[in-house]
């Protein structure tokens, strides 16, 4: 649940902590988890403004569907999926759909785990190029969250901006 507060991309995270509780769980491990989430959010500050909802509806009254958040800026991406139900569920999507990549953009994205401690997600191969139009069917165990960072598999396709130098200062503008 802590990761959800950060991967949703709101940019504003209010944390109300109970120090004795934080210290008592796994020998204070939650403090490390908070630090890891803060570092992740800082690392992805350039892509998180695009964060948007993906997947189903966790509040539909009859079943809890897989849902999450995704963002993409042409060079980087984030994808987080959550299964709030108690049983394993599958979710089928393309990276184009999840990341809301425009139709005129083609290519592949390489996804890797966002956090050090995270199981492999069944149906998604990390560290290899995945075409944005390839259909993926993933299976999330009950009560789970998976978060991934993505980069364009072909760096020559990443939009870039030329940074000039200001006259006589040598300082980048």
Where are each of the predicted segments found?
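C-terminal beta-strand-rich structural cap/linker in extracellular carbohydrate-active enzymes
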Residues: 122-173
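Active-site-proximal substrate-binding groove within the catalytic cores of carbohydrate-active enzymes
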Residues: 1-119, 133-137, 141-142, 146
């Amino acid at each position: 649940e802590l990761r959800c507060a950060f991967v949703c991309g709101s940019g504003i995270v209010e944390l109300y902590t109970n120090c004795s509780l934080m210290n008592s769980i796994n020998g204070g491990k939650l403090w490390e988890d908070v630090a890891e989430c803060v570092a992740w959010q800082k690392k992805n500050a350039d892509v998180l403004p695009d964060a948007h909802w993906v997947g189903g509806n966790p509040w539909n009254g009859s079943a809890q569907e897989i849902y999450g958040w995704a963002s993409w800026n042409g060079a980087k991406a984030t994808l987080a999926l959550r299964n709030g139900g108690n049983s394993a569920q599958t979710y089928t999507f393309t990276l184009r759909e999840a990341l809301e990549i425009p139709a005129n953009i083609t290519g592949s994205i390489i996804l890797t785990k966002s956090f050090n401690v995270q199981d492999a997600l069944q149906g998604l191969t990390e560290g290899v190029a995945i075409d944005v139009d390839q259909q993926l069917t993933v299976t999330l165990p009950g009560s789970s969250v998976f978060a991934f960072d993505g980069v364009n598999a072909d760096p020559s396709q990443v939009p870039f901006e030329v940074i000039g130098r200001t006259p006589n200062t040598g300082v980048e503008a």
